[in-house]
Design a protein with these regions (language model features):
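Short N-terminal or domain-adjacent regulatory/targeting segments
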Residues: 1-19
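Conserved SGNH/GDSL esterase-like catalytic core that processes O-acyl groups on lipids
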Residues: 20-22, 28-125
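Short catalytic/ligand-binding loop motif for oxyanion handling, primarily in non-cytosolic enzymes
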Residues: 30-32, 92-96, 158-164, 228-231
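Acidic carboxylate-rich catalytic motifs and surrounding loops in phosphoryl-/glycosyl-chemistry enzymes
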Residues: 53-54, 217-233
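Surface-exposed cleft-lining segments at the edges of enzyme active sites
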Residues: 110-131, 137, 189-196
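Hydrophobic, aromatic-enriched interface-forming segments
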Residues: 126-177
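Substrate-gating cap/lid alpha-helix
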Residues: 161-219
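Histidine-centered active-site loop/cap adjacent to the catalytic His
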Residues: 231-262
Length: 262
């Protein structure tokens, strides 16, 4: 029975365990109250999982610097790795400074459609950068372990209702407030929810293109549309049971197959 190690290489080495699954990503792998990794560990019959990254990590951060160095290190040191999981991109198109400053027009108050709320050439430009970051990560995996299966995922349709963590700014509602997106029907319906759905759908197309053009075996875990509105803990994260549902219904099958489990 293996354990989960979050950015703790010394503890991994002291344990004497080898790594079966390598994960790199954002809060969907690191969120303290539950995440995808914890229930995935159980669904895969408790392999050793090493997790790189942190809450708030962007795709364009994970593909360089110390995160990338650690990815290379783990792939080189542990030939037993049979699966790589990536969770990235959400922080590139959510949050103050990204959603409002890069994607949404400065004043959407008169908008009646999603397209009317976007800046020129966006969000295509943002997703082009996200796709490039994924391709960079996959190229690193391919250079060291071209045989390893890689799983990526497309999150789900979050609710822009302003719920966040204590001391953390809203990721969706506040940027939409800044851009004066109409509030009719919000937060569960209306233009604001349509923007979230459109961004997730465009992100899915981005990942689909990455999957279809990568020399590495990549599978898109389709989780968008799985969660009920009551299964969100806040604007970006499912409840503990919501994360478990996504693992059981979406992740478990392809991940077990990658590890040779029935």
């Amino acid at each position: 029975m293996g354990h989960i190690f979050w950015n703790d290489l010394s503890r991994l080495q002291d344990s004497g365990e080898t790594v079966d699954v390598l994960a790199i990503g954002d809060s969907w792998f690191h969120y303290p109250f539950n995440n995808l990794v914890t229930p995935l560990h159980g669904a895969l019959e408790r392999p050793t999982i090493y997790v790189i990254g942190e809450n708030g990590a962007r795709a364009d951060e994970l593909c360089k610097g110390s995160w990338l160095a650690n990815l290379r290190k783990l792939l080189g040191w542990y030939p037993q790795i049979r699966l790589v999981c990536i969770s990235a991109g959400g922080n590139d198109f959510a949050g103050v400074g990204d959603l409002d400053d890069k994607i949404l027009a400065p004043n959407c108050s008169g908008a009646t459609s999603v397209a009317a709320c976007y800046r020129a050439a966006e969000p295509d430009g943002v997703f082009a950068a996200v796709g490039a970051a994924y391709r960079s990560l996959l190229a690193e995996v391919n250079a060291l372990r071209p045989d390893v299966e890689v799983l990526v995922h497309n999150y789900d349709y979050a609710i822009p209702d302003g719920r966040a963590l204590l001391g953390v700014r809203s990721w969706l509602k506040l940027p939409m407030d800044n851009a004066r997106v109409p509030t009719a029907g919000a937060p569960r319906d209306g233009l604001r929810r349509e923007i979230v759905r459109d961004l997730i759908d465009r992100f899915t197309l981005c990942l689909d293109d990455v999957e279809s053009t990568s020399p590495q075996p990549v599978e898109l875990v389709w989780s968008a549309g799985m969660l009920a509105d009551t299964e969100w803990a806040n604007e970006l994260h499912p409840t503990p049971s919501g994360f478990t549902k996504l693992v059981n219904d979406c992740w478990s099958g392809p991940a077990r197959h990658a590890l040779g489990l029935p």
